[in-house]
Amino acid sequence: MESLSKESYLSSFHQFPSYAPLPDHIKFESVSSKKIQCSALENISPHQYDILQAPNSRALISALKTLQEKICRLELEKTHARDRLTNLTRVAGEHKKVLESEKQSAELAAKEATNQQNDIGKQLNNAKQRCSLLEKQLDYMKEMMENADTQKTTIHEHQMLTQKEQKEIQSKLKKLEVLEKMCTRLSATHKSAETKIQHLEEKLSVEEQNRKALQDKAAQVQTSLEVNRILLSSASAQNSTQRKVKKKKQSKLKNSVSKEPPSKCFYPKAGELPFVAGKSTTSSHSLSANVQNVLHMMKHHSPQVSQKNPKTAEHKPSVLPGGSRTIPTRLISSFTGDNLSDILLALQDELGQMSFEHQELLRHINETKNTDMREDLERELDYVVKQMEIKSDQIMKLKRHQLNVNKLKKTAKLLKEQPRPTSVTKLAADKQNTGAKDPSTPRRKGDLADGSGTPNSKASLELLKSVRKIQMTLKKDDIMWEK
């Protein structure tokens, strides 16, 4: 049993442990160490070991040798491990240094990356700010462009308006030039008309002077003839009685009145006179010339007027206390008052027509939309208003004149209601007074010695008196007509 254990033990020593092959320098070192150990074993003296004397000394020696070899190997391995540890530590230190350097480089790279990121962020912020500024500038530029476009459009519209206004002004200037030319023409025609009117008035004044001279001569001739007739009648009346003389005078008066009724000669209607105020639509001339013309025709018994009025009523003449007949004052009042009433009615009719035209013009102005037509209508309206004012002034003046005429009528009636003198001396005194009051009237009966005269002469005297009163009360500026 002991032998088996020894063999197993020795066999365990004979069996070498498994290990990895060593490198060349380690093999070299192990061989050298083996040689050293073997030499050390060989140097051991045999007397130092009792094992050599044992029966299994060879096995023991071999086992010891193997142990020594194993120990050597272990030592070699230990040294190799130490060397490896040192190498590993050195490599680990180098690796550590490399890692530290890499770590430092990574930290530096990270720092640089963070710095770069910060720089990039700052640059981005700056870029954003610049972009916002650029956007604001773009918006401002857009607004500027829009404002410029609007200004261009407004300037263009203003230019168009100015051009239109200039065209309108030019058209108005042309119209003004045309109107100025028309005004110059009208002024020239007005001046020529005024000169013609002046010439006509001068001619009328000359004709009046001639007519007055002829009337004076005719009055003188008539007075001389009447004186001769009265003398002849007085000479023939000495043989006859006074009753026969009165009958003859009455028959003569009746014959004269029946042959020539005074109403037909002196008092035609206002519509049949050669000129009546208020009926003419054209430009009229002065009133004094018209009145003189009418008076001339009435005094001279114009057949033109008497033929146009055949249907006038025959008025019964009033009988004076001396036996002579006169033309009634109602006919004179018809000439003075009725004609004025007709003129007033005509003027009022014209004023009504003008008011109707005024309303029509206002309606047309409200309905029209054209500016030129409206301006023309407004001018016509102003002209109509002026004409209406003129007509109203004319109506007021005529009313005042009518009041004056009515006052004169009343005074004439009061004078005629008084008893008239029958003696020849009183009649002569009255005639002299009338001649002194109105020197322009011809003194037809002033030279009469007798108080007896024809009824036609007395009627003409009274008519002349009344007409002269009207002519003295009328003035040129009392009545104004259209021009």
From Swiss-Prot:
Residues 237-261, 303-325, 416-460 are annotated as: Disordered. Residues 243-252 have a biased composition (Basic residues). Residues 420-435 have a biased composition (Polar residues). It is found in: Cytoplasm, Cytoskeleton, Microtubule organizing center, Centrosome; Chromosome, Centromere, Kinetochore; Cytoplasm, Cytoskeleton, Spindle. Pfam families: Cep57_CLD, Cep57_MT_bd. GO terms for cellular component: centrosome; cytoplasm; kinetochore; microtubule; spindle. Keywords: Centromere, Chromosome, Coiled coil, Cytoplasm, Cytoskeleton, Kinetochore, Microtubule. Residues 94-228, 375-418 form a coiled coil. InterPro entries: Centrosomal_MT-associated, Cep57_CLD, Cep57_MT-bd_dom. GO terms for molecular function: gamma-tubulin binding; identical protein binding; microtubule binding. Required for spindle microtubule attachment to both kinetochores and centrosomes. Also functions to tether minus-ends of spindle microtubules to centrosomes. May act by forming ring-like structures around microtubules, or by serving as a cross-linker or scaffold at the attachment site. Interacts with clip1, mis12, ndc80 and zwint. Interacts with gamma-tubulin. Belongs to the translokin family. This is Centrosomal protein cep57l1. It comes from Xenopus tropicalis (Western clawed frog). The gene is cep57l1.
